[in-house]
Amino acid sequence: GLIDVRCYASRECWEPCRKVTGSGQAKCQNNQCRCY
């Protein structure tokens, strides 16, 4: 789901999502990170 991390590129979300979900799968959606 969405996490409270601002972004411009999906790769900016990989590390934050890995910390939250343990998965590096992420996308930047509407300038906010979404983890899968």
Swiss-Prot record:
GO terms for molecular function: ion channel inhibitor activity; potassium channel regulator activity; toxin activity. It is found in: Secreted. Expressed by the venom gland. It comes from the Eukaryota. GO terms for cellular component: extracellular region. Transmembrane segments: none annotated. The record marks K27 as: Basic residue of the functional dyad. Its main location: secreted. The record marks Y36 as: Aromatic residue of the functional dyad. Keywords: Calcium-activated potassium channel impairing toxin, Disulfide bond, Ion channel impairing toxin, Neurotoxin, Potassium channel impairing toxin, Secreted, Toxin. Disulfide bonds join C7-C28, C13-C33, C17-C35. The keyword Secreted applies. PROSITE patterns: SCORP_SHORT_TOXIN (PS01138). InterPro entries: Scorpion_toxin-like_sf (IPR036574), Scorpion_toxinS_K_inh (IPR001947). Has the structural arrangement of an alpha-helix connected to a beta-sheet by disulfide bonds (CSalpha/beta). Poorly competes with (125)I-kaliotoxin binding on rat brain synaptosome (IC(50)>100 nM). Is a poor Kv1.3/KCNA3 ligand. May have as real target KCa1.1/KCNMA1 channel. Shows weak toxicity on mice. Belongs to the short scorpion toxin superfamily. Potassium channel inhibitor family. Alpha-KTx 16 subfamily. This is Potassium channel toxin alpha-KTx 16.9. It comes from Buthus paris.
